[in-house]
Amino acid sequence: MKATQKKIIEHINLAKADGADLVVFAELAVCGYPPRDFLEFEEFISLCEDAGREIAEHCTGIACIVGLPVRNEELAGKDLYNAAYFIEDKQIKSIARKALLPNYDVFDEYRYFEPAREFACIDFKGVKIALTICEDLWNINNNPLYVSNPMDALIKENPDVMINIAASPFSYQHDDERRIVLADNAKKYNLPLLYVNQVGAQTEIIFDGGSMVFDQQGNMLDEMDYFKEQLKTYTLVGGAIEGKPTAHKPMSDIAQIHDALVMGIKDYFVKSGFSKAVLGLSGGIDSAIVCALACRALGPENVMAVLMPSKYSSDHSIKDALDLVANFGCKHEIISIAAAADAFDSMMAGAFKGLPFNLTEENIQARSRGIVVMAMSNKFGYILLNTSNKSECAVGYGTLYGDMCGAIGVIGDVYKTQIYELAHYINKDGEVIPENTIVKPPSAELRPGQKDSDSLPDYDTLDTILFQFIELKKTSKDIIAMGYEETLVRRIIKMVNGAEFKRYQTPPILRVSPKAFGSGRRMPIVGKYLA
């Protein structure tokens, strides 16, 4: 929090030097969003209050809007509000409180906050500001989630401008929805709108920034950078923000996912106090993608790739992995697991006497690799990156305490078909992921001649069915009606539900889709409902 406070004060001074009258920060900027159960600690709230007072001391010659939790002084209701200070001349002149508290997907605000029921505009230098917080502007569509709308109360005071501070998480295509909602608000209330969004990652939740300005007709006047901290100045004259309508700068879904994952890795390391990563590099496409993203996020000098061949590893897999290491310039070690796997086989020979080789021995190999990369993590202080993709996580195609171990799941919200798109995107300026890694059939290489297709349908089919079930919440009947074979659909959905116990034990997964595994998708392990 001290580092955040320092950064806020630095930007107050930068804005002041640029001649600004008012500087605006994002939702809960003082403590970061979401603070989760930190909010249950009295000391944490006191630290937020101390930070707010310290920030106020630097607001001379410039006013400030900054988000932070504030106490509910009433006896009834939750102890806190999600709120924002309006600070002028070192004084906290007013406090805006959030009314519409999201309680879906990754949001859990009713757990901590009381909704606001009273609203008032801010008067500043002859300008009346309608200040709202994130969700407060999202009750405008044809299917409202809430029974009230804070702007309907604020508009009665005849404001000159709307300001909305937000911590709106990234998922691909969500920026399009965001722009529509903001433009609709500007048009509905016939007011210019300044929207300020958080940028950065908080554990698995990624915030893409992309703050925007709209005129009263709903035309976008400016769009700040995505996945990047930025300070920009705008001028309000005669109830209008100066500027001409500008077009949105589109990014493909894959470009957005790439940039989000790079930032997610980087912020996880910075905020955890670590700088170096380790991962298992198999020569396959999943670990190649994670290695590439880690090198871009942390620098190749901070990435250790560990090749762990077994007697079932192909020569081309080892070559592909070494080619990738050479292309990125990261460090690597080659540590064979053959001796470890043989030792386990020998150790278990009595108990397994007369039983054939099966999934048990395959999992022993995967867990041997897990032991190796965890040992490297422990010995050298690396953070272990998990390399499981969303398709595998969905159907349980992975080994607990083996290839599913790690501190952060980098691609656990990226389907296998998207992984291939990411590979081509990373290679767009030149081949760094070897072509053979991309074109060869995917394989865990845990038995002779093994391919993913031995256990799973083709990934185009699998990912389509998974997307319909997980993201769109379609039932098996819905998906079968789309033309997919009934036995296959029911088998896949059964695999998804049967793998829930594994997902409870996976590392946090960087969220890039509208429905990621983790806090945004909460399913029972022992439930019998199979959709």
Go through the PLM ranges and name each one.
Residues 1-280, 291-300, 332:
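Enzyme catalytic cores with a strong preference for nitrogen-chemistry domains
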